From Swiss-Prot:
InterPro entries: TPR-like_helical_dom_sf. Pfam families: RapH_N, TPR_12. One of its GO terms (cellular component) is cytoplasm. Belongs to the Rap family. It comes from Bacillus subtilis (strain 168). This is Regulatory protein RapK. Its main location: cytoplasm. Disruption phenotype: Deletion of the gene has no detectable effect on expression of the srfA operon. It is found in: Cytoplasm. GO terms for biological process: establishment of competence for transformation. Involved in the regulation of genetic competence development. Inhibits the activity of ComA, a transcriptional factor that regulates the development of genetic competence. Likely affects the activity of additional regulators, in particular Spo0A. SUPFAM superfamilies: TPR-like (SSF48452). Gene3D superfamilies: Tetratricopeptide repeat domain (1.25.40.10). Inhibited by PhrK, which prevents RapK-ComA interaction.
Length: 371
């Protein structure tokens, strides 16, 4: 039986990558299943195998971001593979750096991610493809968003949005890019604009009939309402996210439970908050998440029991979040804790949390200096 030409498989890989870039999750899953079978019959070609391995990693990241599946440890981003990739072509080398940067950003290794995005950008200049440019802009913007560099992030994401608007097949990407723009407006305290962008993204998600994306957007919109001090709207948005079946089964469900607990405690709905706290404990047994376990424990100990007696538990969980490089969580929860202890006259304890908040701010500013 004759072997399948590697060029034929490479063409199918290109189609797979287009599906990934369009954020077409079901199509990507279909290609992944079909392409694996082709390799048994393909003539040997190391470059095509490398391309497949890169897309496999990118596919995993798509399932994580767009369906809330756990992200497995990468298997391809090694020094040996990098050395091989640099001897191939600009597109493969660009993808290697881009995908590894995304993975490092996910792991909060921001210095490494920044360096890799810089390498990717140099290779991008050799690739005349505006969709590829939009993909790059959106990923870099997301990194800037994570470290609260909102103005720079907006510059990149507006470029991505402009490109995606010219390509109707990329509506899911347009929605997620609009979501990033909304998040940056929220970080700048421009809440009306943030709300407007989120609602626009939700409308786009409805057009695509992507229920998971819609739930994700409602969850993120709830964060805007929380920061805007609109608890009723925050809770309403969270209910829409939590009520979504695909969101319920994803790793992101615990994020919404955390938000609900925080908001209910904030408005003194203690019994309702404890009810969601119990749901969170059940979920954490099924899906371990040490970061959210610590975050939820902090909230519970700030609002339940004798506050002064809960200091050690709260501060130890803050220290754990610091070790995990959860800068935004340390910043937010340290401030809540500081104000709670300050309200009962426990100024020494409050100072410990204010210092933790300052630490987080300084760390984020260090990242800004690198950027």
């Amino acid at each position: 039986m004759s072997k399948i030409a590697s060029e034929v498989v490479a063409t199918t890989l290109n189609d797979w990558y287009i599906a990934i870039k369009k954020q077409k999750v079901d199509e990507s899953i279909k290609y992944y299943s079909e392409i694996k079978k082709l390799f048994d019959e393909m003539e040997e070609d190391q470059e095509v195998l490398a391309y497949y391995s890169l897309l496999e990693e990118r596919h995993k990241m798509l399932l994580h971001s767009s369906r809330g599946e756990p992200l497995q440890k990468h298997t391809y981003f090694t020094e040996d593979n990098q050395n091989f990739i640099t001897k191939t072509n600009d597109k493969l080398e660009y993808n290697f750096y881009l995908f590894e940067a995304m993975y490092e950003a996910y792991n909060k290794n921001y210095d490494r991610a920044i360096n890799l995005y810089g390498l990717a950008e140099k290779k991008l200049a050799e690739i005349p493809d505006e969709i590829e440019a939009a993909e790059f802009y959106s990923k870099v913007s997301y990194l800037y968003t994570l470290v609260k560099q909102s103005i720079v992030a907006q510059h990149y994401i507006k470029n991505a949005i402009s490109i995606y608007k010219r390509h109707p097949d990329y509506k899911c990407k347009l929605a997620t890019s609009t979501m990033i723009a909304a998040a940056n407006y929220a970080d700048m305290k421009r809440f009306e604009e943030a709300e407007q962008y989120y609602l626009e993204a939700i409308d786009i998600a409805k057009e695509t009939k992507d229920e998971f994306l819609k739930a994700q957007l409602f969850h993120n919109l709830s964060i805007v309402y929380s920061d805007w001090n609109k608890p009723d709207k925050c809770i309403e948005s969270l209910e829409k996210a939590i009520g979504n079946e695909s969101w319920l089964h994803s790793i992101y469900y615990i994020n919404s439970l955390f938000m609900m607990i925080k908001e209910l405690f904030k408005i003194d709905e203690k019994m309702k908050a404890i009810n969601f706290y119990n749901k969170a404990q059940e979920r954490l047994i099924l899906m371990e998440n040490k970061v959210y376990e610590a975050k939820i424990s902090i909230l519970y100990n700030l609002y339940c029991g004798e506050l002064k007696n809960n200091f050690n538990n709260c501060i130890s969980n803050i220290e754990f979040l610091k070790q995990q490089n959860e800068l935004e969580s340390v910043d937010e929860l340290s401030y809540i804790a500081a104000k709670r202890f300050e309200s009962i006259g426990a100024f020494e304890e409050a100072t410990s949390f204010f210092n933790a908040k300052i630490w987080a701010e300084q760390k984020m500013n260090q990242v800004e200096g690198i950027l």
